[in-house]
Amino acid sequence: MFIGYCKINIFLPESLSLKKKRQVILGIKDRMRRRFNIAVAEKPLDKWQIAELSFVCVNYTRRCVEEQISKVEEYLRFQGKFHIIDCEKQVF
């Protein structure tokens, strides 16, 4: 059994408040859960233009886990509401 982990730091240039950030982040989290069936977590909660999203998936084959994590990163790169600052991927 393999576990895939992806941590993505994003910058939200249009977010002028924590409320606006929450709207954008909740939308991202919901879409990612529905589209890719993965677990999503967010931090820090107190900064209004920076977010760190962590994604985790589990599968029996390493190839499937790597593909899923790559699809998540690729999907997020083409969203227009934020910029990806950093991306870290690991498979255990």
Q: What positions do the PLM features span?
A:
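C-terminal binding/interaction regions
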Residues: 21
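Short, charge-patterned binding micro-sites
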Residues: 3, 42-61, 90
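A common structural junction motif
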Residues: 27-31, 36, 73-81
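C-terminal structural segments of small proteins and small subunits
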Residues: 58-92
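A short linear hydrophobic-aromatic micro-motif
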Residues: 37-43, 83-87
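Short glycine-/aliphatic-rich beta-strand segments at the starts of folded cytosolic domains
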Residues: 4-14, 18
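Beta-strand elements of well-folded, non-transmembrane domains
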Residues: 10-14, 34, 59
